[in-house]
Amino acid sequence: EFGYPVQALANTNGLFAFSANQTAQPYAQSSIIGGRTVGFPYASFLLGLVDHGAINPVADLRTGKHFIALFAQDSWKVTRKLTFDYGVRYDYDTYPREQYGRLPTLAPGLANPTAGGHPGAIIYESTCNCSFAKIYPYAFGPRLGLAYQITPKTVFRAGFGVAYDGTATAQTGTASAAPANNFAAPGFGDPAMTLAGGVPSNYLLPWPNLSPGAYPNPNFPTTLNGPTSIVDQNAGRPARQTQWSAGIQREIVSNVVLDVAYVGNRGAWWLSSILDNYNALTPQILAHYGLDINNPNDRATLRAPIGSTAAGRFQNQLPYAGFPLTATVAQALRPFPQFSSGLTPLWAPEGRTWYDSLQAKVTKRYSHGLILDYAFTWAREEQLGVEAGTVNDYQNRMQNKSISGFSRPIVSVVSANYVLPKWGPNKIFSEIVRDWTIGTVLSYGSGLPILSPASTNNLSTLLFRPTFFNRVPGVPLYLQNLNCHCIDPTKQLVLNPAAWSNPGDGQWGTAAPYYNNFRYERRPAESMSFGRVFRFRESMALTVRMNFQNIFNRTQLQNPSATNPLAPTTCTAGSGAVCTNPATAGLLTGGFGFVNYLAGDFVSPRQGTLEMRFQF
């Protein structure tokens, strides 16, 4: 009998950080004296004085799920001109689960021992003997199709179907079930630990850690770190998309077919992590405590440390014993003040999508060596909560519906292949030029939308939610036409900061995430290829092919900076007003609408690759 023990451990990385504080004079307290700071981090390292760090418990975590599907379909030729297709598919998909139920989530009503018994503790499927989410058992997807020959050269086609996506994959790392035990120095100049003394036993957390007080860090509860996963109760519901189309197919002339169709779909239950914030301050919570976000005095109170006199009537009114006095009043009033995060939901199927399009396609079937396809799409794509960074106010959910960040209303694509025929009576010349294949794919379309800039009014310090700048009506969004091919990025900014205004302190912005007329430069994609197969005998052939990208060598500049309309314009001569005069500015180096010319082109210059392959 032979054997060998195998043990695979994950999450074994940790952190020891060293600071100047441990080798500085205590009275200095990080002050700058004579232009220099006191203390030296490398000296702290040599002495083994650790300022802060993290100990990750080793873990052996495994998440998985199950999926089955059944389908049936049939085609019924009702008459010589009418064909009817029908079918149904059933999907059953579970949500990801840790094999032994060690993945944590939040129990809103359970007392948290680390937070003095305040509601909001951690539970595990292995300890609650429950399932975090429900599995959707009704994912039936019918499919219907119809084709009717109106005339010998004209066919009407229509279709309808319901399709289901899979549930989420296991988007959790080992740290989700084995949180890092972060530690910090108890005071200025004092080490959190020494390398000579090793890691203190109280810094070590067991694995698995199934404590209801696993968050915040039991050894350092003032860090207010929250759980990394809040499993949504509907995590077992797959996304659903309802699709339909109707169109006409017509043979215009011999070997040329035209297709025109309306194609649409509606999606629901797509994964979203941005439509909920379980730990934000709402108007109802503020009203309960007699606070008004529109009152400047109340805003000052919310931003004040709860242990300071600026907190007013909230001074030292701690939500639980041990709550840090340096935390703000706003933090203390959160639904779960023991956590500083928004408690993002995991696998929440709340996103929605909309798509409507007119699609036309012309197909030149193979004849005389030529195959040609031209496709044109005129579409509108909208989404709600599916794409990151696109929610302005989750409490007014439908206000966040906007065009998709991948929206391209107009797209044209040409693809063609042509095989050169025999040329002339000269056999040698004909043999050289014949059978070469020339292919191309040319794609043209609208530019992608630019995300509205995020406000800098610090609303997140009050309500723990961000917002957007306001769009100023009637003010042009651009200073230069992004598609004119006439921009000098060293001298010109392309976006207009005056088109945006910052909401007032404590106010929500009114802008949508995306606007149809606020887009980046159009990005053509043009490629071409040349090739031929030389056959020597039946079993031997040489393939020669040359592929070109950006065949017309177009210059495409980088996308402009569009994050902060209040950002100062900078140039080699300085910043601010001096940069507005091209005669004195030198070269631009930053600002709202700045195109970073130092980063090179958005698309590489024309390049080609030669491929040769010999088969035998």
Segment roles from a protein language model:
Residues 1-480, 484-487, 505, 509, ...:
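Short acidic-glycine motifs
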